[in-house]
């Protein structure tokens, strides 16, 4: 069979063209990273071949010594990176090189700000990979053949990084991939041996595969006399996680993080640990400093890289960490698992549960240590990943208390939107006799801060957590207590401040309730269709009325979220609490006209609904009643 000679020209998609152009210009200030990306890809290709060759040894084609080779030609101004890894067939070339656009691209494009520094970090999270070659090259050639295919099934892909690329079949004896960069006029430094060596040592020394380059001629040695090029390995070529911690520098740890995560920023923290005993494994886990743009997509691939006895098995092994820690990057290398391990086997292996439990505890311990010793760094973590960590109490019962210790909240202590108060700090400031942790949930921070439910708490100097994120109501549904203190939603059920109310206060409340009983019955009749109950409040000191939900009913904020998502919500009516000391209520109590009493009661109910961020079921009726009242007042 001979190679197909036809050259096919194909166009990049519009979105892909924009992204390619943006990448080239946004990353120009840090252009040498292109080599790190290409070497990293070559290493991944070798890992994939090793894995597939476990079941199909013939894929190695009598060439089991996997390596990466870098060549350059100063005169031709070219640089080539060659690996003898898995390679690609024609369809894979089109899928991997011809299409940048993929799931999440539109969201990624929408997040771009025009700020070059910020955008370059975002581009790094998206995964530049191969396309970074166009930062320094005005033309890129890819010659590749998939392991196990015929030499005639080689593929040549060529592009100048503009609107299109060409692809054709070629004869290629060796499996694997060669990328040839035709360097731009002002990028000739990347055809210099010493410059390339320094970049490899800086960014890719940790690559477990040997990276080789032509040996530099010794001083006085004539290059022309050599019959063939001699190569030498220029990196350490040992898996970084397999080295002793004392032998690895911080810079090496940071560069390895960028290799496994394809991130451009340094990690916040990392932990390198060897476990021996019943289970034998090494882990190197990282906490990133920036959240990926698609972090809230719970379906996207996640997890650590899994190796067995230094042999790559899979990317995104999600079985080793729970979903709420999906932002963690790193490597797990086990000596106990089978080389033929699959995702299905991982789900059934009890040893994986033990490793998952230990790794989860390690991450939570890292965060606890950071929060205690480096609060500023933890504040950075919380801003990026706090909302995801809030998923933890619902997913991880065993570590609920540890996760709760890491949560941060806005509270009435500072009255700002900054989520920087821990539950431990709240408990330290609790009033004498206080046995609950109080919180309010609202649609946004201002609604929470100004909630009428807080009035008695402000009067008594009791701190309240101000919760206003979409996940908060759901979080508190799974976080019943912390450090022996129960959580209490100040907008739910009856308010009992326990020892924080004096006996005199309680007796006074009983007397008022008895005196206002006829008024309560009258209002209950007026609002029978809208409310479950009318009662005298202990919460309000300034507002005339507020709405609360039953102790076991769904919170108002959760109800609004579910309704907005089009989900069925169980029917329930709120409770209206009336402040008997407010002039409006006292005036209403004296109203003799029952129709007017009913109208004013409805206005009071609707205003209470608006005050807590709710919406009116019948806005037109509210406006009509209000206009009627205003007209009466003006007359």
From Swiss-Prot:
It comes from the Bacteria. CDD domains: HATPase_Hsp90-like (cd16927). The keyword ATP-binding applies. One of its GO terms (molecular function) is ATP hydrolysis activity. Belongs to the heat shock protein 90 family. Homodimer. This is Chaperone protein HtpG.
